[in-house]
Amino acid sequence: ETMLSFDSGMIGFPLRLLAREVYDKVIKKIGTDKVALITGEEKIIPTNAKYFLCTVESMPIDKNLDFVGVDEIQMCADHERGHIFTDRLLNIRGNKLTMFMGSSTIKNIISKLNDDIEFINRNRLSKLTYSGHKKISRINRKTAIIAFSAEEVYAIAELIRRQKGGAAIVMGSL
């Protein structure tokens, strides 16, 4: 919403699926001719694109845009991808507004970059709760299951597919 209030803008996301999800929402609002999607796997760049939804790694750094946002900026601390997030933190700016979204764990570092910084805390839009250990057969639709290894993710997904008929997998290191 904030990006669309400007004449042009770009947001970098940590996950390509998130960039795609937001792209789909934005094109429903304003159409496909002004919105670009740039990830490692997809490049949809209309000639007259004014808005760019990208993975952080795929953000074009040569664009002159009113708004620039980077989601999950605390990923600067990640040992694998942190250098990209840090580069965006230090080098990419919107002409009118730059917004870094994410955890307050990086607030102290960001506050040293510029005196004219405003920090805004927003409540989570959806509620995330721990429901304890449950049998797969008793989970509700649209339940998120968190696992901590790729092997465990695929094993749980296969079990859900067999018992419930389907599962979606999203993996990342946030």
Labelled PLM ranges:
Residues 7-22, 98-101, 138-171:
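Conserved strand-helix element at the start of the C-terminal RecA-like helicase core
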Residues 18, 58-59, 74-76:
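Residues immediately C-terminal
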